[in-house]
From Swiss-Prot:
Keywords: Methyltransferase, Repeat, S-adenosyl-L-methionine, Transferase. The keyword Disulfide bond does not apply. The lineage of its organism: Eukaryota, Metazoa, Ecdysozoa, Arthropoda, Hexapoda. This is Protein arginine N-methyltransferase 7. Residues 14-357, 366-698 form the SAM-dependent MTase PRMT-type domain. Pfam families: PrmA, PRMT_C. It is an enzyme of class 2 (transferase). GO terms for biological process: peptidyl-arginine methylation.
Length: 698
């Protein structure tokens, strides 16, 4: 039986009712569960298997029976490894019922049906009811990028108290967390608002005092650190061990700790960031190590380089790829400026039950500090990408080149549409006679109001909705400006909401003022067939893993993805290298002066470079003015002209769209595509297929 759910359409801004099957939430959760890329992580799988084999063999040699508990079994892969290695009994628990049901089928298909499967959280297991006796070997994968963010501390503490014997071993046995302090003008753009200069370098807008004094958010910024351009940062110290977790310890793991570490500077600089990762010892002897370090700090880099068969693979991608365990950036609340190599400072490291945070001091701190949080609205309102976008110099210069020309007469009256549009406020600083700023979001508006006050801008009026714009005010408007950026947008073309607002303005006032100038005046969507090095694995079928048949898992995920996932998903492609297999092709062009026009287009792209086309990258180019000057284009795609067969350099402050292709592409040299755009309904649909022949024109 179908039901209806209310969903906001980012392109129209309207809540719409969507018909969904009763099991839609189930399919959505399955499709987004994220088990897939873990099972493509060959290093993780091989080292878990080796540790399980070695540990069980050692317990057998010591004359012990082996009773295994697998917490969070997922597909059952670790439980099957334990059974294959000779465990006497194996109990697996999985609280996510769809996954547990799938695990039961996978266990049966792999002759492992006598694994005891409990459809509960481990913390809900009752000894004597769910398990006949305690286990003496715990195998689990309870970790995330922060190590402890999925509740590992509490789960291990409960397991030792209620489910394990006193001499139980654990796989993994131990974990060590590492921190490396760094300075990066690029990464700092993700955390603070910089001065906005005009094209001559003179100051247009200064950040308010509360922004400069704000400590920011303590939360991690998870990224693929290895993909940071080497020239964009300097590490200021060697990696430092900050926390150690002994998962085999019978005594409870501490829920909160502080560790103040003395760090020596390897070069002068500003301590702005902490690069963070962890390493686990899977077996008790510590022989099976798995490190999440970026390539420059990876303990096995030389060995991995020697064994890598792809000699064209970039150095940053030699280390095993994984998207479930990445690295993280933590931002120091107040940068510490140090001038001499060899100088020492104190790095304060904290963790609670689920998260970490950091601070840095010149002198050893005497009192513990509370976890810091945003007090300026910037960090709590905008994503890291958006904060970086606000600071993006080349991007801002293109908008300012348009705005300086637009308001040069000093009689310009500007209507600004978009969330957190500082560039719109810049038009007031450039001399616009008046600026009307549509800003319906409370925190975003409060932030912009503080910018107006701090910079003493006298000619700015904020609007909660377009209905507040009086007819006489609308009649004076000479320019309508947007970046565009809206908080509800996920995919690049969700920002076509700008066109919806233009239509609303026409409906409210019958027509737009004569000769009003709209910027951006147009937008174009481009597509590029690519070969991802690794990103495609998040949607690629597993088939088999360490000798176990996982096709039932593939089938379940595929069925759910078809019902719950979008054709295109948003990804920050700078973190995921890919090679271009052709030149980009335009799929759709939108004229914002005639936004309501429906369109259907189709075409073909010939793949001219060797490679396996496993994805299509999509982005939007915004045309700020009608002239064809390339500098009037702001792109959310490649930063440099695309070279077929070469890696693409992507914008680092926006997410692009990605359509994944899970089919064999040998002998298929044409990407046939079609688009259907229905702006009044907020619908933009894509269809892609790889074929041996070009699509015939109608």
């Amino acid at each position: 039986m179908a039901s209806f759910a209310q969903v906001i359409n980012p392109m129209t801004g309207q809540n719409t009712w969507q018909e969904r099957g009763d099991d839609y939430d189930y399919h959505q959760e399955v499709a987004n569960a994220g088990f897939g890329d873990m099972l493509h992580d060959w290093e993780r799988n091989q080292k878990y298997d080796a540790a399980i084999r070695k540990t069980i063999a050692g317990m057998r040699q010591a004359g012990k029976q082996v009773h295994v508990l697998d917490i969070g079994t997922g597909t059952g892969i670790l439980a099957m490894m334990a059974l294959r290695a000779g465990a006497d009994t194996v109990t697996a628990c999985e609280a996510f019922v769809p996954m547990a049901n799938c695990a039961a089928r996978i266990l049966a298909a792999n002759d492992a049906a006598h694994v005891r499967l409990i459809r509960k959280r481990s913390t809900d297991i009752v000894m004597g009811v769910d398990m006949p006796h305690r286990a003496n070997l715990l195998v689990a994968e309870l970790l995330d990028t922060e190590l402890i963010g999925e509740g590992a501390i509490g789960i291990y503490n409960h397991a030792h108290e209620e489910l394990l014997t006193d001499d139980a071993l654990c796989i993994p046995a131990r974990a060590t967390c590492y921190a490396q302090v760094a300075q990066s003008p690029l990464a700092s753009q993700w955390n603070s608002l910089k001065i906005l200069p005009d094209l001559d370098g003179d100051i247009l807008l200064r950040p308010p005092t509360q922004l400069l004094q704000c400590s920011g958010e303590a939360a991690l910024h998870d990224v693929q650190l290895s993909q940071l351009p080497p020239h964009s940062f300097h590490v200021l110290s060697e990696p430092t061990q900050i926390f150690h977790f002994d998962f085999q310890r019978k005594q409870p793991l501490e829920l909160m700790r502080e560790n103040v570490v003395r760090v020596q500077l390897s070069r002068p600089g500003s301590v702005e960031l902490v690069f963070y990762w962890w390493q686990i010892e899977l077996d008790d002897a510590g022989e099976q190590l798995l490190s999440c370090a970026p390539y420059w700090a990876h303990p096995e880099l030389e060995q991995l380089k020697a064994t890598c068969k792809d000699k064209q693979r970039p150095l940053a991608n030699i280390v095993p790829w994984r998207d479930h365990w990445m690295q993280a950036i933590y931002y120091i609340p107040k940068a510490l400026h140090l001038h001499d190599a060899g100088e020492e400072f104190w790095l304060r490291c904290y963790h609670d039950e689920y998260s970490l945070w950091f601070d840095a001091h010149k002198e050893q701190p005497e009192k513990p500090a509370r976890r810091h949080s945003c007090t300026c609205d910037l960090h709590m309102t905008y994503t890291r990408n958006r904060i970086g976008q606000l600071n993006q110099s080349i991007r801002n210069k293109r908008y300012l080149a348009y705005l300086e020309q637009a308001v040069q007469s000093k009689s310009a009256h500007v209507l600004v549409m978009g969330d957190g549009c500082l560039l719109g406020l810049a038009s007031a600083a450039l001399g616009a006679a008046s600026v009307y700023c549509l800003e319906p979001h409370r925190f975003s508006r409060r932030l912009l109001e503080s910018v107006v006050k701090h910079n003493q801008l006298k000619n700015v009026k904020f609007l909660d909705s377009l209905k507040q714009l009086e007819p006489n005010e609308l009649d004076t408007i000479t320019h309508i400006f947007a970046e565009p950026y809206f908080l509800n947008s996920i995919l690049p073309w969700d920002n076509f909401y700008f066109g919806t607002l233009l239509l609303q303005l026409e409906q409210l006032h019958q027509k737009l003022p004569a000769n009003v100038e709209i910027s951006p005046c147009a937008a174009r969507i481009f597509a590029l067939p690519v070969e991802f090095l690794d990103l495609h694995k998040i949607r690629a079928p597993i088939v088999s893993c360490e000798g176990f048949d996982l096709r039932l898992f593939d089938d379940m995920v595929q069925r759910s993805a078809e019902q719950a996932l979008s054709q295109v998903e948003a990804q920050p492609l700078w973190e995921y290298p890919c090679r271009a297999l052709a030149q980009p092709q335009q799929l759709l062009s939108v004229d914002f002066a005639n936004f309501g026009v429906e369109q259907s287009n189709h075409g073909s792209i010939k793949l001219t470079a060797e490679g396996n086309c496993n994805g299509i990258a999509l982005w939007v180019d915004w045309q700020l003015s009608p002239n064809e000057n390339p500098k009037s284009i702001v792109s959310s795609g490649p930063l440099e002209p695309v070279e077929t067969g070469q890696y693409v350099k992507w914008d680092m402050f926006v997410r692009q769209g990605v359509h994944f292709i899970n089919q064999t592409t040998a002998e298929k040299k044409y990407l046939n595509w079609s688009t259907q755009f229905r702006p009044l309904l907020g619908e933009l649909n894509f269809n892609f297929s790889l074929n041996a022949n070009r699509e015939k024109s109608e």
